[in-house]
UniProtKB/Swiss-Prot annotation:
UniProt keyword terms in alphabetical order: ATP-binding, Ligase, Nucleotide-binding
Family under the similarity heading: Belongs to the glutamate--cysteine ligase type 2 family. YbdK subfamily.
Catalytic reaction list: L-cysteine + L-glutamate + ATP = gamma-L-glutamyl-L-cysteine + ADP + phosphate + H(+)
PANTHER family the record matches: GLUTAMATE--CYSTEINE LIGASE 2-RELATED
Keyword Nucleotide-binding: yes
Annotated function: ATP-dependent carboxylate-amine ligase which exhibits weak glutamate--cysteine ligase activity.
Top-level taxonomic group: Bacteria
Organism annotation: Legionella pneumophila (strain Paris)
One Gene Ontology term from the biological process aspect of the record: modified amino acid biosynthetic process
Coiled coil: none
Protein name, per record: Putative glutamate--cysteine ligase 2-1
Record has Nucleotide-binding as a keyword: yes
Length: 373
């Protein structure tokens, strides 16, 4: 089946998807509560959309399409409040975080949906290990060529989003030493990584995608687990590297950071993207996952080594006029605060050092999601 035409969207509109953890309040482990949560949400007036995820201890929510930070944040608060209310009725906690600190993958149950069952049959145990939680950010594009230009221009900024959103230091009761351990699980899938370097939509659709479809490996764009991928049915590019933050404020701020970056890149303020930019892509990605804001990057154009935290601060200065135009100054101030106060991964480690139990770490995550304003 040919790839559908790229839908025209209003430029720089944005939307957010969040994968959230469903927590038993008796032991703070994940709980297979999504069927019950989904049933209750279906009876409520939900201010967005909600869908199951691959295991029953997960829930995905999505916002509407927005142009500005205030609108996006307002809806995320409304979604959060609705989720908390429904969770309270079932005695289920809901929180962010890229991984649950001590859940065992083998205990997870695949949600009864045809696609999820097919994925489970194909990938085996990896499917249950995919009980991880990310934020996806969509940015509207006017056409497919523009989408591919932005997708490849953003490649050097992927480490920013990994480090700023990092919230997955613990896996199966161990400190992984990573700030974002979640992405290691994604990399296990054969169709993960980055998109092929193609800047023309017809070439991507008729050349690359049709060839991949003819191999029998893929049926749709959903089969690609790329860090950034085009979504022709939405008319967007979708960034998939972010851990789910602990608060909806951070989720909104990350979306607006991407929005401002796209506005900046569309003015051709940087050299055009090139295939060789990807020579350092996996190394820079690793640095952000492992060391977070303390990582060191190799600039893809100059091969200069730069501190990740300083690169974010330099970028924030460049984006200031674009944020002013987009009414997202407050969002970028939040990003600035992360560079000084630390990421959610740092917060979770601090709470573990304070309380010495991972159950307490989960409880702190629940408080962050519920009480943020």
């Amino acid at each position: 089946m040919p790839l559908q035409p790229f839908k025209t969207s209003n430029l720089l509109t944005m939307g957010v998807e969040l994968e959230l953890q469903l927590i038993s309040l008796s032991n703070f482990d994940l709980t297979a509560a999504s069927p019950d949560i989904l049933e209750l949400l279906g009876r409520s007036s939900f201010p967005g959309s909600f869908t199951p995820e691959i295991t029953e201890s997960m829930l995905e929510i999505a916002t509407d399409v927005h142009e500005e930070y205030d609108q996006l944040l307002k809806q995320l608060f409304h979604i959060r409040d609705t989720l908390v209310t429904v969770g309270d009725r079932l005695n289920i906690g809901i929180c962010g975080g890229g991984t649950h600190p001590f859940q065992m993958w083998s205990n997870q149950r695949i949600f009864n949906k045809t696609r999820f069952i097919e994925v489970s049959e194909l990938y085996g145990y990896l499917t249950k290990q995919f009980t991880i939680f990310g934020q996806h950010i969509h940015i509207g594009c006017e056409d497919g060529n523009q989408a591919l230009f932005l997708l490849h221009s953003l490649n050097r900024y992927i480490p920013h989003f990994i480090a700023l959103s990092a919230s997955s230091p613990f896996v199966q009761s161990k400190d992984t030493l990573y700030n974002s351990a979640r992405l290691n699980s994604v990399f296990a899938f054969p169709l993960s990584g980055r998109a092929p370097f193609v800047l023309n939509w017809d070439e991507f659709s008729l050349g690359y995608f049709e060839k991949m479809e003819h191999t029998g490996i893929v049926k749709s764009m959903k089969d690609f687990y790329w860090d950034l991928r085009p979504k022709p049915e939405f008319g967007t590019i979708e960034m998939r590297v972010c851990d789910s933050p602990l608060t909806v404020e951070r989720a909104a701020a990350l979306a607006c950071y991407m929005q401002a970056l796209c506005s900046y890149l569309l003015e051709n303020k940087e050299p055009l993207p090139h295939e060789d930019d990807y020579l350092v892509y996996n190394y820079n990605r690793f640095q952000a996952c492992r060391f977070g804001l303390d990582g060191t990057l190799v600039h893809p154009k100059t091969y200069e080594q730069i501190l990740l935290r300083e690169d974010i601060l330099t970028t924030l200065r460049r984006l200031k006029p674009y944020a002013n135009q987009l009414n997202s100054t407050m969002a970028l101030e939040h990003i600035y605060e992360i560079t000084h106060k630390g990421s959610d991964a740092s917060f979770l480690r601090e709470k573990y050092a304070e309380h010495r139990t991972l159950e307490s770490v989960v409880n702190e995550s629940l408080k962050q999601f519920r009480s943020s304003k």
